[in-house]
Amino acid sequence: MLQNKSYVRKTRAGKIEKVVKEHYLRDDIYCGAPACTVCDTSAARLSPNASTILVLDTNVVLNQIDLIENPAIDNVVVLSVVLDELRNKNLSVYNRLRALCSSPVRKFFVFSNEHHRDTYVKAMVGESPNDRNDRAIRVATQWYQRHLGSAVRILLITNDRENKRKAVEEGIFAETVESYVKSLGQPQLLDLVVQPASEDVVMDDVEDLRPSKKKIIYSEHKPMSEITAGLHRGIYHQGKLRVNRYNSFEAYVGSESIGDEIIIYGRTNMNRAFDGDIVAVELLPQDQWHVEKALSIAAEVGNYLRAEDEDEDVHLVPNSSDDAPRNASVQGPNADASLNSARPSGRVVGIIKRNWHSYCGSLEPMPLPAGIGGIAHALFVSKDRRIPKIRIQTRQLGNLLDKRIIVAVDSWDRLSRYPSGHYVRTIGEIGDRNTESEVVLIENDINCRLFSAQVLACLPPLPWSVSSEHLSDPNREDLRHVRVFSVDPPDIADVTNFVHPGTPLDDEASQRGTSVYLVERRIDMLPKPLTEDICSLRSDVERLAFSVIWEMTPEADIISTRFTKSVIKSCAALSYVEAQARMDDSRLVDPLTTDLRNMNALAKKMRQRRIDRGALTLASAEVKFQIDTETHDPLDIGMYQIREANQMVEEFMLAANVSVAEKILKHFPFCSLLRRHPTPTREMLEPLLRTAAAVGLDLDISSSKALADSLDRAVAVYFCSGDLSPPEYLHYGLAAPLYTHFTSPIRRYADVIVHRLLAASLEISKLPTVFQDRPQLTSIADSKDVLHNDLLHVTKFWDIMPVYLNYRHRNAQMASRASVELHTIIYFRKHPTDTEARIVKIRSNGFIVFVPKYGIEGPVYLTAKGDNGGGEWVVDEQHQQVKKADGSVSYNVLQMVRIHLEVVEPQPNRPKLQLTLI
């Protein structure tokens, strides 16, 4: 049966055109119920013992997905009209529902009501799309009732009063979410139910029992129409809000319209915005802007703490450019400072797109009696200090007080000091190492599930070995006769020989994006048979590789470069320590050791040449733990030692990445995946310049060459070559005009993409279709994180790929850091110690120190926390010094001090490492 859909649209050229689409209807679409006597039961997904089959409307799925994911909710028919609406409204929820539908252990069935002759409905004249879709849901529910008869009850679940009223009038069984959940006899499930806004908990009952305290706390958000108009007129400014990780009362919004970051100070000015929200901001009058000063943040926060009855554990200053405004600081006693040095400050007037998701943390008991029916109200405190407390209601308060739990945000009324949310699930006991490690993974959206059977089926059977087909492949060079040894050389495992585009293995790798390295474990991007066997370049074992081969002069000048897929047989698999020991042992003169020394000599010349071009040679503190093999607790902590062998490998890997970047860009100028490092702005470097000046150094920051030994805060990112002009390809830190990632396809999906591009440039294989077809969206877009806020508009593969990979790369880094922080807390809780530290930043009530022995950076307070140091301590900004008013004691930037490190818990369930001056 054929139906025609027609509509008119406006083209980009401004023309109006009529579009006609054919819509085919069928009468042989299965219902999915085993009890059916008409349909083919081999296609049944629902339980044969089901007494009730649920049909959910769109808003129920949108708002109750946490409940729906609970195993108690099963035997569900998911209508295609609901899926279509979800795809347009919330891709994250859409993907979660699709996962339920494809899960072999859940009983969810997708019914294509929009393509069934008896359930498709046309929109009536004057009927809104929402009303038409509600009617389609009721029609499909009625069809199921007639189709299955008395064999099973069909129940429509909806919280829409009008939809429920019409359903009952039409003879359909219908219930609200709460009513149905109560009928299940599992009271704990009610904690998962999101209350409709109109039925939310009364503010008086939760926040204050005195009606006089009920007042408007936040300004009303502007409607989108007013926000859009204000953005066009330049009254409002759009950007992503980022909350200071160490001061949750301070945030900033990067604004392209004014070319600067707008400081948002205080919860009132944040106006219910969460970290990561896309917001509209209105600038405050200039006399209210904050002036850049080296002042105490904690003191200013204290004013807000008293004003808002909060009790946050606020650190002295942020220590990452990702966590705080570039030059943000609060206005201090010198209020008459020149406004020329003030930073733009503003307030949030509207939320353009929310970044709400689930959060890990614990409950803070509230001095309120349990409600009727055992309902208790509690405040949830997130592990992420940037997130405000969230109020929830629960029927299992006693079981949750000592647990790490997950809570989702539902709403935030302007009459409420806190947002409202609901309990999702329990992670485990507070303080348990496994529980806290799982929190790290959840907070950073790390996929640690086991590889599915479909993914593992893509792997070749073990034991695997190089076959005669590989050796006879004209596109693969036999290098087994060449002396090859692995200290991670330019011969890179040929991962793409086993990871083919469009397979479940490739889909899984693309969604994971990268391997994640925690202190006690590694979460692989690819299954272990590949990472630890088939693609591991072992000694005396034949392996497939993708090789970069250079011809070089003794001065490390590259004469020629070629690339080939190869077969190698490594004569040695050396660790960095083993390679260094060989090079250092003058008694060894064997060919392998001689090769190592020759390569090291070349690497030194290559490194010097990079430095001469202006490459930055900055070392970051990498902490190394000694872990107990039985308890997995840290036994010792120290800095990771970098050897010449590490630098040798680094140079050849960098050279390989540069060579591959040049090759793929030459062949695919518009669709190469490259990596760039933007040049930092002067504002980013101001703190460095002040510090250098204080110790008598005058830095020239006009070029990377002049700034080769300085810090910068720009972050290297992936990008598609077709999206930027060639001058923007620059990798500032490496002083390389072109750069990509090729050398680690085992642990980075970016390298897998580059391998495919390189193979296509060599005509070894065809370029995957998706690389050429820019409007296509791949399964990568279906991953949860690509659905956050600013990525929802992405509709092109090459638009989404770099953004997604950058997101995954950053999350992996943040998870690694969080794991280090967790194990640092575990270690110093048992081993408090005294050690040396170097002052790196000065503040009026203390300073930030770096502890070289442990790679730790943190605040040291000279005054009581909350005291801004006024009177007793004075800051000399010119000399980067904090001193007593009488001049008897002073501390300077880069000065060594002795400190005490110990773990304290100023707030329940929030342990932190405290640094105290001795």
What label would you give each PLM region?
Residues A50-T58, A72-D74, V152-L155, N159, ...:
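Core residues of folded domains in eukaryotic genome-function proteins
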